Amino acid sequence: MARSKIVKHIFVTGGVVSSLGKGILSASLGALLKSRGLRVAIQKYDPYINVDPGTMSPYQHGEVYVTDDGAETDLDLGHYERFLDEATSRASNMTMGRIYKTVLDNERRGDYLGGTVQVVPHVIDEIKARMLDLAKKGSFDVVITEIGGTVGDIESLPFLEAMRQLKLQLGSKNLVNIHLTLVPYIKSAAELKTKPTQHSVKMLLEIGIQPDILVCRSEHPLSKDIKHKIGLFCNLSDSDVVGLCDAETIYEVPLVLHEEKIDSLVLKKLMLKSPKPADIKDWKDFSGKVKFPKDGVVEIGVCGKYTKYPDAYKSIVESFIHAGAANNVKVKVRWMHSEDLEQKDCKVNEMLQGISGILVAPGFGERGIEGKIEIVKIARERNIPFFGICLGMQCATIEYARNVCGMEGAHSTEFVKKTKYPVIDLMEHQRSVKQKGGTMRLGSYPCILEENTNAFAAYGKNLINERHRHRYEFNNQFKEELSAKGLVIAGASPDGELVEIIELKGHRWFVGVQFHPELKSRVHKPHPLFISFVAEAKKFRDEMAVHHYETSSVETV
């Protein structure tokens, strides 16, 4: 069938409280529309004044998600990519900081012809132009735009005003606003309360926006009476009020929304026909594997410095869910704070009890670095499956240099500038860089794999492309010496100058990568390295169980 020439727009806003799951809602709706044969693009607008989240603390913002083209973006873009299996780009994430920067640059060039620069029209016009820009970058049927923040926040007002004007400009059949709210359950009264949702919609109405669809998060299903009440006070028909009951996993949300017929509702309001009915079989299969794994639980220790805030490692956690489903197991992450491992009274054996694999996570800064190096040593000496990502790979290199190659005090120049053995060093092109924001080696780069390695076995091919975010690299001055002692260069840049993957001879599964494989894992396409790592951890678990059984049997006799 012929596709509509007009791109349809869906704007997702949130009210009552933050962290309701606008990103998951947007990604889930996008996945449903894609399953109907529609081409979907998705973008996030963040109200903070930072240019991007690249320099923000993981404790405040969580993970920085890097795109193929090297943009440092909001972690919601990870949800978009994982759910839709579509690559995002720099154009997929916009901040108020970038908007203001553009407007000020325009003013300095004289683009406004001496006029007084104001929020309306100049800032709003720039926002509208950016919001429509993504639609021009491909032959899309639908563009979903998530607006960050909560309705009522002063920071989000320009984005909401831009949306209001766009709806007037494009027409109601070409732009739909879905408003996500909370319907809290009060245990003492044993009932759901609709008043917060009513007030949230009232705030939208005060700035000239009538939401087209309400999606109501709740602990319990919404009754027909509740939906009718919400619709009555929010100027909506009952069918425009969609219930979103809490799900066991985020991967059930597309199924819940499809059950509520939100995809059909959206298409009806946009007057858009889909090429085919929604196909959610893969989602049902995946959800079943996640909830009911056939082969039990595999516990993997993740060592990092931000473990008190798991959102800092969001893509790693999700990658384990994907790889676990592929291996018919549930991966249980046991967080291991790297600073705890530096304490003299650290009970390592207790910490490792039941662990079947160790992952040393990426990060920056000296804090906790010796703890990471210590856990690498333990994984190497005890032949525990090991996976090091970015800084984790660098820690593995340092540990091997110190404890196997006799390079006492070996380190990274990130932490010890004048170390005798700088096995990890600043990249040459980074030496003249002064600014921190957006200046690392960012984005997708090719890597050539060596055959007869765990990496090659996982990928099944020689050439791969992976995403990066780093300033420091393996120092090639020590490549020959480390290789002679059993360290394997399993992957490198096409020119051979940048070491991308290291492994160890004689170890069951020891892989360190300079890139970030977690950024390319998808719901229906788990990352090969995570699949391989979890598979080896599963084997380790089973072997330890047999060993424990045999040991117990001997002791009993």
Swiss-Prot record:
Subunit relationships: Homotetramer.
PROSITE patterns documented for this protein: GATASE_TYPE_1
Residue sites binding UTP per the record: S18, K193, T194, K195, P196, T197, Q198, K229
Paired cysteines (S-S): none
Segments forming a coiled coil: none
Domain Glutamine amidotransferase type-1 positions: 299-543
Activity-regulation annotation: Allosterically activated by GTP, when glutamine is the substrate; GTP has no effect on the reaction when ammonia is the substrate. The allosteric effector GTP functions by stabilizing the protein conformation that binds the tetrahedral intermediate(s) formed during glutamine hydrolysis. Inhibited by the product CTP, via allosteric rather than competitive inhibition.
Residues annotated as binding CTP: S18, D153, I154, E155, K193, T194, K195, P196, T197, Q198, K229
Family the UniProt entry places it in: Belongs to the CTP synthase family.
Region of interest (Amidoligase domain), ranges: 1-272
Lineage: Bacteria, Pseudomonadati, Chlorobiota, Chlorobiia, Chlorobiales
Binding site for L-glutamine: Y59, G363, L391, G392, M393, Q394, E414, R471
Ligand binding (Mg(2+)): D76, E146
Functional summary from the UniProt entry: Catalyzes the ATP-dependent amination of UTP to CTP with either L-glutamine or ammonia as the source of nitrogen. Regulates intracellular CTP levels through interactions with the four ribonucleotide triphosphates.
Origin: domain of life: Bacteria
Extra facts: CTPSs have evolved a hybrid strategy for distinguishing between UTP and CTP. The overlapping regions of the product feedback inhibitory and substrate sites recognize a common feature in both compounds, the triphosphate moiety. To differentiate isosteric substrate and product pyrimidine rings, an additional pocket far from the expected kinase/ligase catalytic site, specifically recognizes the cytosine and ribose portions of the product inhibitor.
Binding-site list for ATP: S19, L20, G21, K22, G23, I24, D76
Gene Ontology cellular-component annotations: cytosol
EC annotation from Swiss-Prot or TrEMBL: 6.3.4.2
Listed pathway(s): Pyrimidine metabolism; CTP biosynthesis via de novo pathway; CTP from UDP: step 2/2
The encoding gene: pyrG
Cited NCBIfam families: PRK05380.1, PyrG
Any one GO MF annotation of this record: identical protein binding
Residue numbers annotated as active site: C390, H516, E518
Catalytic activity: UTP + L-glutamine + ATP + H2O = CTP + L-glutamate + ADP + phosphate + 2 H(+); L-glutamine + H2O = L-glutamate + NH4(+); UTP + NH4(+) + ATP = CTP + ADP + phosphate + 2 H(+)
UniProt xrefs under CDD domains: CTPS_N, GATase1_CTP_Synthase
Keywords: ATP-binding, Glutamine amidotransferase, Ligase, Magnesium, Metal-binding, Nucleotide-binding, Pyrimidine biosynthesis
Name of the featured protein: CTP synthase
